[in-house]
Amino acid sequence: EIEENAELDLFESFNAHAGDERISAVVADMEAELGKGNKMAGILPRLAQYELTLLDWAEAHKGSRKYVVFANKCWPAFQTQFGFVPCYVNSRLTKIGIPVACEVDIYGAVSEYIGVCVSQKPVTLLDINNTVPADIYNDDIAGKFPYTHKDTFMGFHCGNTASCLVKEPQMKFQRIMKRNLEPDSEPNISRGTLEGDIVDGNITFFRFQSTADAQLKGYIAEGEVLPVATRSFGSIGIFAINEMGRFYRHVLVQKNYPHHGAVAFGHYGKALHSVMTYLGITDIGFNQPKGMLYPTENPFAD
């Protein structure tokens, strides 16, 4: 069941939580979670107010349903009106089994929820369309890991990944929004990201998606996060998936998938494939090994 509400409705509810007596307890919990990474303590009360807003909203609106996910708008008007970026709160709710997808990504939220059910662990939602700089690949990956440059990519989002999945998590600000919205001042309304390199280890990148004619499709690709520093910002990691370049071209791009992918931390391809099959999905893309051509792949290409 989907309930659609305006950002204005959320803003009204947020304002109604001003002065909520529970805010101090949530701030204390945030402080304990962040530890030495609590670099912008002044924004925590507003973030706590927003977290309570979402939790109360879920309880008040779930009706007979047992589980809830959110697909929320998070920019550009959000910062100027709410006074922060919501990434850290999104990460905290996802950590406790209430996925909050960025940028109103409904199928991203559904994908995250299924990932939680399959893995029984927190998941995340990342952009899948950023390359690894050549110098990082040449210096830290080539000859050390069994991947070509095209097998690797940067999985990135502003700061929405749970603290348990990030190395040395720190409360920071969204740099792009800072440049656009408050270029000449100290970070204020751009504060609220949870930043750090994502923990290395096995992962499964996947997504459930609908087509314009209401047909479900999906993709699954197992891989890993490499133990290589990203030298960047946000919740970010260097991912490696065998034959990623071909998979990106012939599945993600050719089949019009959005740039968000859900990430489960472990290899769960078998279970996710079964879930997709149970849901009647027949178009299930995966990273086909070298020599196993995609239907439109040129057999004469290098």
Features from the language model and the residues they span:
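Surface-exposed beta-strand edges and their flanking turn/coil or helix-capping segments
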Residues: 15-18, 85, 138-141, 276-278
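Short, glycine-/Ser/Thr-/acidic-enriched flexible segments
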Residues: 75-77, 161-163, 268-269
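C-terminal catalytic subdomain
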Residues: 94-231
